[in-house]
A protein has these predicted regions:
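Acidic/histidine-enriched, glycine/proline-rich intrinsically disordered or flexible terminal extensions
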Residues: 186-228
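A conserved beta-strand-loop-helix scaffold within acyl/acetyltransferase catalytic domains
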Residues: 62-128
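Conserved acetyl-CoA-binding loop-helix of GNAT-fold acetyltransferases
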Residues: 128, 134-147, 166-170
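A short beta-loop-alpha structural element at the N-terminal edge
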Residues: 45-57
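Conserved acetyl-CoA-binding loop of GNAT-fold acetyltransferases
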Residues: 13-19, 146, 169-178
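Conserved beta-strand-loop-alpha-helix junction that forms the acyl-donor binding cleft
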Residues: 1-4, 155-165, 181-192
Length: 228
């Protein structure tokens, strides 16, 4: 998001932003931090994505320039077995709506690698629409997703997602230290010096770590398609 880029800009790391966006970070939450959970902002509501709202989800989940990539990802990971639609996706994909009913944020939990016999709970595609940030929507949505989830819960992100990493840390997520997860390198060691420069000191020193990524690693090895 724009704010993440501004943090890199303020740290004099503009030139690294695009490259760093290709680095992999993996996190685990064994149990959410209760003090981080928040109620919905007044008048807002949460509902599931309807089968006729895939285009709405794509617009919420990523910048419009990534629509084709998101369509491909949906078809490979969420639609499943060549089906056009998978009811499980629409049961798990949440929209946060303003009092007027407008969806402004989305996120979902998913049972990744279930088809290959190594099911793990993952969190993904959490995003608040630009212009709607800073109003507590992301924190409220993540609270609801965690209330509905099984654990441990894993996610994949990049060191350019500074604000999200801080949010995940508040909710009890720990950065995995395992050097490889499935077929992807874990770029934690390369990312930490950068994060130290772009995060507030208290937030950076509040990061926690875990070496409990073996189950996720084994699950991710079961398919060449990255399901989270």
């Amino acid at each position: 998001s724009c704010k993440d880029w501004e943090l890199y800009h303020q740290a004099g790391l503009d030139s690294l932003y695009e490259t760093v966006g290709n680095l992999n970070l993996f996190l685990i939450c064994k149990r959410p931090e209760p003090s981080a959970l928040r109620p919905l902002p007044e008048g807002c509501s949460i509902r599931t994505c309807r089968p006729d709202e895939l285009d709405v989800w794509k617009h919420l989940a990523a910048e419009d320039s990534y629509a084709d990539s998101l369509t491909d990802y949906y078809e490979r990971v969420y639609a499943g077995n060549g089906e056009e639609q998978n009811p499980a996706f629409f049961q798990r994909c949440l929209f946060l709506c303003t009092p007027s009913g407008k969806p402004v944020a989305t996120g979902l939990t998913w049972l990744s690698y279930a088809r290959t016999g190594f099911p793990v709970n993952t969190l993904g595609w959490i995003r608040v629409l630009p212009g709607e940030e800073g109003r507590g929507f992301g924190r409220a949505l993540l609270s609801e997703l965690l209330r509905r989830s099984d654990f441990p819960l894993y996610l994949h992100t990049q060191p350019t997602s500074v604000c999200a990493i801080r949010l995940y840390s508040d909710f009890g997520f720990h950065l995995l230290t395992n050097p490889v997860i499935g077929y992807r390198k874990n770029d934690l060691n390369a990312s930490l010096p950068i994060l130290e420069k772009v995060m507030r000191p208290a937030a950076f020193h509040g990061l926690r770590f875990s070496n409990e990524g073996q189950a996720l690693h084994q699950a991710a090895l079961s398919s060449r398609i990255s399901e989270f």
